[in-house]
Amino acid sequence: MSGLKQELGLAQGIGLLSTSLLGTGVFAVPALAALVAGNNSLWAWPVLIILVFPIAIVFAILGRHYPSAGGVAHFVGMAFGSRLERVTGWLFLSVIPVGLPAALQIAAGFGQAMFGWHSWQLLLAELGTLALVWYIGTRGASSSANLQTVIVGLIVALIVAIWWAGDIKPANIPFPAPGNIELTGLFAALSVMFWCFVGLEAFAHLASEFKNPERDFPRALMIGLLLAGLVYWGCTVVVLHFDAYGEKMAAAASLPKIVVQLFGVGALWIACVIGYLACFASLNIYIQSFARLVWSQAQHNPDHYLARLSSRHIPNNALNAVLGCCVVSTLVIHALEINLDALIIYANGIFIMIYLLCMLAGCKLLQGRYRLLAVVGGLLCVLLLAMVGWKSLYALIMLAGLWLLLPKRKTPENGITT
């Protein structure tokens, strides 16, 4: 069985990761951070990047030495065996019914802002977005990367244009003096802003598709992380400068409001299109990553439908299965009018648990200073689970339930059950 096609370069990797991190958050999170922390949020971004760096470095080193479509599940399997590898894979896949429909709703919301769509029109927009993801996905990782590199360029261009038109100068940035930082507001902002950096685990599934994973995967991960952090910080400066936040204003409306203020109502469509593309980019990388994880998990039976690749070395069957689940979840949620706010928090707990499992794998697989970074990253993940509070029990219950209920299977070589 031949593997996935290795076609990604450094620039494409940077585009994939930065758009997966920006995603649905770039239009909303800066306003939310400004709401809870005010000017303190300007310090929160660099602090958050410093805190995330140990986790990112561990992801980068593991991806360099053990590139696989299985991503974190593969790292965990290398460290702790195939059973926990399968549990980790299914834990990641359990986000599909909750997280992806929520992101689809956010993306379709830009259609509502532009055209006044409601109900079935928004549903059609969500299904159309999934169809576009399918088309891009069947063209290969390189096509996704090229598109998402263009999208990150548009996002950066929008922020630069706002800075230029708004005449924002470094002297005007309201940085609080270090002695005046309110720690309560800083911690509150960090708890909101961490979700902007959920995306490293999805990027890990693409490590095996780099032309030179040992060289380019770590570089793409670190540069993409810094680029996304810089864009988020620039957005926060803009939101604070124009006072475009508040309890009575939808967070995602902050940047469109600024665009209208600076460039007129006719420019609203530009902000909405870029906002939609940012959401699409995040959806795309997650769905492509889910497909590669499903394909990887099916490799124990090479003749299985989901284990097959197309003539272009693309896991189309796995992609179709993932998108089928997304369509069903979207239709059910639309029919039942389910409120996803609380469920998204539960899903975030699962992401942190996956990060924690990756750090534990790093503690076993890595040596020297990288093992120390894995320990630091693991402690940070435990702290983040504590910040989620009792809702983190959902992730713990899912982990325990999968471990106890996931059917055991025999390895064909020696008949051992795992």
Model-identified regions with their sequence ranges:
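Membrane-interface "cap" regions at the ends of multi-pass membrane proteins
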Residues: M1-A31, L35-N40, A44, F53, ...
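Hydrophobic transmembrane alpha-helices that form the core helical bundles
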Residues: L32-V36, P54-L130, W134-T138, V152, ...
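Transmembrane helix-loop junctions in multi-pass membrane proteins
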Residues: V26-P30, L104-A107, I136-S142, G266-A267, ...
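A generic transmembrane alpha-helix motif of multi-pass inner-membrane proteins
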Residues: L360-T418
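Helix-loop-helix junctions that connect adjacent transmembrane segments
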Residues: G3-L4, L42, G116-G128, N146-C272
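Small-residue-rich segments of transmembrane alpha-helices in multi-pass membrane proteins
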Residues: L17, L21-G25, I151-A165, G224-Y232, ...
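Transmembrane alpha-helical segments of multi-pass small-molecule transport proteins
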Residues: V47, M114-G140, I151-W163, C196, ...
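TM-loop-TM module centered on a large, flexible mid-protein loop between adjacent transmembrane helices
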Residues: H74-G81, A113, M222-N284, D303-A342, ...
